[in-house]
Regions:
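N-terminal hydrophobic targeting signals that begin at the initiator methionine
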Residues: 1-2, 22
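Sec-dependent signal peptide recognition
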Residues: 3-11
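C-terminal motif of bacterial Sec signal peptides marking the signal peptidase cleavage site
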Residues: 17-20
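Local sequence-structure signature of Cys/Sec-based thiol-disulfide redox active-site neighborhoods
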Residues: 22-50
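Solvent-exposed loop/turn segments at secondary-structure junctions
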Residues: 34-38, 60-63, 89-92
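Thioredoxin-like thiol-disulfide oxidoreductase module
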Residues: 58-79, 103-111
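Non-catalytic, surface beta->alpha helical segment in thiol-disulfide oxidoreductase systems
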Residues: 86-126
Length: 129
């Protein structure tokens, strides 16, 4: 019950931090993308930009990565929010097994090897592969 209350409070805080935020997608800041107002949360529906570098992960892991300041995108500087990939990213070739490895690494406070992620990400939308 306390965990659910924490989730609700975190989400409510994120929504209150910027009235321009969409309610259904929460992600963190990355180069080339616009944040919503003054908050550090990036909103994107992943429909119109093939260069998006991150997406939402389950909220518990998202919060944990943020608290541990784990940046999984090499282009981030130390003062920017951590970047995490999502389960739905399997559609671009990022398998659920790799997602579990990624999530476990976040929980343990480690940075996994994302070589395969970047390779597959560059092929996203390519139907001839």
């Amino acid at each position: 019950m306390e965990r659910n209350l924490l989730k609700i409070l975190v989400i409510a805080g994120l929504l209150l931090s910027s009235t321009s935020c969409k309610k259904n997608v929460y992600s963190v800041k990355v180069y080339g993308l616009k944040s919503c107002g003054n908050c550090r949360i990036l909103i994107d529906d992943f429909k119109d930009d093939e260069n998006i570098q991150l997406h939402m992960i389950d909220i518990d892991t998202h919060i944990l990565a943020y608290k541990k300041d784990i940046a999984l995108y090499d282009g981030l500087s130390d003062n920017q929010a951590p970047v995490i990939m999502t389960k739905s990213f399997a559609k671009a070739g990022y398998s659920s097994k790799e997602y579990k490895v990624l999530k476990k690494a976040i929980i343990l406070g480690k940075k996994p090897n994302l070589k395969n992620y970047y390779k597959r990400r560059s092929n996203y939308g390519n139907t001839t592969q």
